[in-house]
């Protein structure tokens, strides 16, 4: 049986729908379900429902053979896992954003303060792309509040539609990275290469359609 770590929430549902279209599973996963382990015995698959930032850890240590996780998490955590496939779902992007209408002034400002859930991504971007040393404040949610309340000048965050930014008087200054869900594995998973290759091949056919 292959164990797959899935991030709780909408991405898990999207992944299962993709697996169903590829005739790999016969189960449904509800976003409201409290079950943490879900088995599809008919297809010899077991799903672990974990927090998105925990998916690479479960895969890295071999508790899960493969996992599905956003590219943003992989960029932030830099775990020893292998990207097998871009699933083309959960699409969004990482952006530098801030108060509307003053982007030029803030981008030129020295000693910037950046609030973000992704301190490593923010640090790498400012150091290696912009060549700047900035102060980074890590937050775990509602990052948009930081520049509104004066905690930071700007934010680095995930953007899907941009609606949340707009409703809070913010706008995208720069697009940093395109993000989508990735299928990942660890070195130990090579012992299941035949089964995993079958999953990859079937998913690739669905993605290309």
Swiss-Prot record:
Swiss-Prot/TrEMBL catalytic activity: 1-(5-phospho-beta-D-ribosyl)-ATP + diphosphate = 5-phospho-alpha-D-ribose 1-diphosphate + ATP
Membrane-spanning ranges: none
Domain of life: Bacteria
Pfam families (alphabetical): HisG
Keywords: Amino-acid biosynthesis, ATP-binding, Cytoplasm, Glycosyltransferase, Histidine biosynthesis, Nucleotide-binding, Transferase
Disulphide bonds in the chain: none
One GO location term (cellular component): cytoplasm
Pathway(s) served: Amino-acid biosynthesis; L-histidine biosynthesis; L-histidine from 5-phospho-alpha-D-ribose 1-diphosphate: step 1/9
Annotated GO biological process: L-histidine biosynthetic process
MF term (GO), any: ATP phosphoribosyltransferase activity
EC number: 2.4.2.17
Enzyme class, broadest EC rank: transferase
Subunit note: Heteromultimer composed of HisG and HisZ subunits.
Protein name: ATP phosphoribosyltransferase
Organism: Caldicellulosiruptor bescii (strain ATCC BAA-1888 / DSM 6725 / KCTC 15123 / Z-1320) (Anaerocellum thermophilum)
UniProt lineage: Bacteria, Bacillati, Bacillota, Bacillota incertae sedis, Caldicellulosiruptorales
Gene that produces this protein: hisG
């Amino acid at each position: 049986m292959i164990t797959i770590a899935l991030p709780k929430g909408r991405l898990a549902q999207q992944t299962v729908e993709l697996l169903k279209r590829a005739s790999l599973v016969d189960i449904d996963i509800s976003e409201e379900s409290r079950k943490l382990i879900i088995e599809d015995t008919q297809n010899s698959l077991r799903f672990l429902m974990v927090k998105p930032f925990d998916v690479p850890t479960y895969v890295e240590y071999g508790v899960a053979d493969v996992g599905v996780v956003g590219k943003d998490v992989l960029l932030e955590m830099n775990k020893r896992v292998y990207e097998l496939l871009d699933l083309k779902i959960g699409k969004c992007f990482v952006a530098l954003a801030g108060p509307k209408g003053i982007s030029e002034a803030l981008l030129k400002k020295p000693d910037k303060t950046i609030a973000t859930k992704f301190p490593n991504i923010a640090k790498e971007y400012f150091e290696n792309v912009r060549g700047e040393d900035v102060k980074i404040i890590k937050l775990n949610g509602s990052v948009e509040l930081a520049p509104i309340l004066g905690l930071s000048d700007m934010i680095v965050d995930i953007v899907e539609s941009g609606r949340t930014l707009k409703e809070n008087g913010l706008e995208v200054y720069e697009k940093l990275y395109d993000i989508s869900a990735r299928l990942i594995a660890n070195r130990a998973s090579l012992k299941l290469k035949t089964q995993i290759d079958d999953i990859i091949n079937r998913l690739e056919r669905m993605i290309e359609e």
